[in-house]
Protein backbone atom coordinates (compact mmCIF):
# COMPACT_ATOMS: atom_id res chain seq x y z
CA UNK A 1 0.00 0.00 0.00
CA UNK A 2 1.18 3.48 -0.80
CA UNK A 3 0.91 6.74 1.07
CA UNK A 4 -0.80 9.16 -1.30
CA UNK A 5 -1.95 12.75 -1.32
CA UNK A 6 -5.22 13.89 -2.82
CA UNK A 7 -7.09 17.15 -3.11
CA UNK A 8 -10.50 17.63 -1.54
CA UNK A 9 -12.76 20.64 -1.91
CA UNK A 10 -15.79 21.17 0.28
CA UNK A 11 -18.02 23.08 -2.13
CA UNK A 12 -20.12 26.21 -1.45
CA UNK A 13 -23.31 24.26 -0.69
CA UNK A 14 -21.69 22.20 2.08
CA UNK A 15 -19.79 25.21 3.48
CA UNK A 16 -23.12 27.09 3.69
CA UNK A 17 -24.67 24.14 5.57
CA UNK A 18 -21.88 24.39 8.18
CA UNK A 19 -20.83 20.74 7.82
CA UNK A 20 -17.07 21.23 7.36
CA UNK A 21 -16.33 19.69 10.77
CA UNK A 22 -18.54 16.68 10.09
CA UNK A 23 -16.78 16.08 6.77
CA UNK A 24 -13.34 16.50 8.39
CA UNK A 25 -14.33 13.94 11.05
CA UNK A 26 -15.06 11.44 8.27
CA UNK A 27 -11.66 12.04 6.67
CA UNK A 28 -9.91 11.49 10.00
CA UNK A 29 -12.00 8.43 10.95
CA UNK A 30 -10.93 6.88 7.63
CA UNK A 31 -7.26 7.41 8.49
CA UNK A 32 -6.72 10.44 6.25
CA UNK A 33 -4.62 13.31 7.57
CA UNK A 34 -5.31 16.90 6.60
CA UNK A 35 -1.84 18.15 5.63
CA UNK A 36 -2.89 21.54 4.22
CA UNK A 37 -6.12 23.50 4.35
CA UNK A 38 -7.55 26.91 3.52
CA UNK A 39 -10.90 28.59 3.03
CA UNK A 40 -11.14 30.75 -0.07
CA UNK A 41 -13.72 32.38 -2.31
CA UNK A 42 -12.56 31.34 -5.77
CA UNK A 43 -12.42 33.94 -8.51
CA UNK A 44 -14.05 33.07 -11.82
CA UNK A 45 -10.57 32.81 -13.37
CA UNK A 46 -9.36 30.38 -10.70
CA UNK A 47 -12.45 28.18 -11.08
CA UNK A 48 -12.17 28.20 -14.88
CA UNK A 49 -8.48 27.30 -14.70
CA UNK A 50 -9.01 24.55 -12.11
CA UNK A 51 -11.86 22.95 -14.09
CA UNK A 52 -10.31 23.63 -17.54
CA UNK A 53 -10.45 19.89 -18.31
CA UNK A 54 -14.25 20.31 -18.52
CA UNK A 55 -14.17 23.48 -20.66
CA UNK A 56 -15.94 21.89 -23.64
CA UNK A 57 -18.55 20.07 -21.55
CA UNK A 58 -22.12 21.44 -21.44
CA UNK A 59 -22.04 21.78 -17.63
CA UNK A 60 -18.83 23.89 -17.51
CA UNK A 61 -20.47 27.32 -17.10
CA UNK A 62 -22.87 26.08 -14.40
CA UNK A 63 -20.00 24.36 -12.57
CA UNK A 64 -17.90 27.54 -12.57
CA UNK A 65 -20.90 29.67 -11.53
CA UNK A 66 -21.56 27.30 -8.63
CA UNK A 67 -17.91 27.16 -7.50
CA UNK A 68 -17.71 30.97 -7.30
CA UNK A 69 -21.10 31.33 -5.55
CA UNK A 70 -19.59 31.21 -2.06
CA UNK A 71 -16.52 30.20 -0.09
CA UNK A 72 -15.01 26.73 -0.42
CA UNK A 73 -12.81 24.77 1.97
CA UNK A 74 -9.81 23.24 0.22
CA UNK A 75 -7.62 20.57 1.79
CA UNK A 76 -4.84 18.19 0.85
CA UNK A 77 -5.39 14.77 2.39
CA UNK A 78 -2.66 12.19 2.99
CA UNK A 79 -2.83 8.51 3.84
CA UNK A 80 -2.82 4.92 2.60
CA UNK A 81 -4.65 4.88 -0.74
CA UNK A 82 -5.89 8.40 -0.04
CA UNK A 83 -7.34 8.93 -3.53
CA UNK A 84 -9.59 5.85 -3.54
CA UNK A 85 -10.42 6.24 0.14
CA UNK A 86 -11.58 9.84 -0.37
CA UNK A 87 -13.63 8.86 -3.43
CA UNK A 88 -15.31 6.09 -1.41
CA UNK A 89 -16.11 8.58 1.37
CA UNK A 90 -17.58 11.06 -1.14
CA UNK A 91 -19.90 8.62 -2.89
CA UNK A 92 -21.32 8.83 -6.40
CA UNK A 93 -21.32 12.22 -8.16
CA UNK A 94 -25.13 12.18 -8.18
CA UNK A 95 -26.22 12.15 -4.52
CA UNK A 96 -29.39 10.24 -5.47
CA UNK A 97 -27.11 7.35 -6.55
CA UNK A 98 -24.63 7.71 -3.67
CA UNK A 99 -24.55 4.96 -1.06
CA UNK A 100 -26.13 5.75 2.29
CA UNK A 101 -23.56 7.12 4.72
CA UNK A 102 -21.38 8.78 2.08
CA UNK A 103 -20.69 12.52 2.16
CA UNK A 104 -22.81 13.20 -0.92
CA UNK A 105 -25.73 11.03 0.24
CA UNK A 106 -25.74 12.84 3.58
CA UNK A 107 -24.96 16.46 2.61
CA UNK A 108 -25.50 17.03 -1.14
CA UNK A 109 -28.69 18.31 -2.78
CA UNK A 110 -28.12 17.61 -6.47
CA UNK A 111 -25.63 16.44 -9.06
CA UNK A 112 -24.51 20.10 -9.36
CA UNK A 113 -24.56 21.05 -5.67
CA UNK A 114 -22.86 17.81 -4.68
CA UNK A 115 -20.94 18.97 -1.58
CA UNK A 116 -17.40 17.85 -2.41
CA UNK A 117 -14.72 17.46 -5.08
CA UNK A 118 -11.96 14.87 -4.93
CA UNK A 119 -9.08 14.03 -7.23
CA UNK A 120 -9.79 11.01 -9.42
CA UNK A 121 -6.25 9.68 -10.01
CA UNK A 122 -2.64 10.10 -8.85
CA UNK A 123 -1.76 12.33 -11.81
CA UNK A 124 -4.69 14.69 -11.29
CA UNK A 125 -4.12 14.68 -7.52
CA UNK A 126 -0.55 15.94 -8.00
CA UNK A 127 -1.70 18.71 -10.36
CA UNK A 128 -4.67 19.69 -8.17
CA UNK A 129 -2.70 19.78 -4.89
CA UNK A 130 0.01 21.95 -6.47
CA UNK A 131 -2.66 24.24 -7.99
CA UNK A 132 -3.93 25.25 -4.55
CA UNK A 133 -0.87 24.50 -2.39
CA UNK A 134 2.24 25.33 -4.40
CA UNK A 135 5.32 24.07 -2.61
CA UNK A 136 5.80 24.85 1.03
CA UNK A 137 2.22 24.95 2.31
CA UNK A 138 1.82 21.15 2.60
CA UNK A 139 3.10 19.52 5.78
CA UNK A 140 3.69 15.82 6.34
CA UNK A 141 2.68 14.81 9.86
From Swiss-Prot:
It comes from the Bacteria. It is an enzyme of class 2 (transferase). Its EC number is 2.7.4.6. ATP binds at residues 11, 59, 87, 93, 104, 114. Its cofactor is Mg(2+). Gene3D superfamilies: Nucleoside diphosphate kinase-like domain. It is found in: Cytoplasm. The keyword Transferase applies. InterPro entries: NDK-like_dom, NDK-like_dom_sf, Nucleoside_diP_kinase. The active site is at residue 117. GO terms for molecular function: ATP binding; metal ion binding; nucleoside diphosphate kinase activity. GO terms for biological process: CTP biosynthetic process; GTP biosynthetic process; UTP biosynthetic process. SUPFAM superfamilies: Nucleoside diphosphate kinase, NDK. The keyword Metal-binding applies. It holds the Pfam family NDK. Keywords: ATP-binding, Cytoplasm, Kinase, Magnesium, Metal-binding, Nucleotide metabolism, Nucleotide-binding, Phosphoprotein, Transferase. NCBIfam families: PRK00668.1. Major role in the synthesis of nucleoside triphosphates other than ATP. The ATP gamma phosphate is transferred to the NDP beta phosphate via a ping-pong mechanism, using a phosphorylated active-site intermediate. HAMAP family: NDP_kinase. Belongs to the NDK family. This is Nucleoside diphosphate kinase. It comes from Cupriavidus necator (strain ATCC 17699 / DSM 428 / KCTC 22496 / NCIMB 10442 / H16 / Stanier 337) (Ralstonia eutropha).
Amino acid sequence: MAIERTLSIIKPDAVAKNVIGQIYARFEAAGLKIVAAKMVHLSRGEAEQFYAVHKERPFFKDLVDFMVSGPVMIQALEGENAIAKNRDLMGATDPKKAEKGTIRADFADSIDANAVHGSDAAETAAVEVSFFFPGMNVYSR
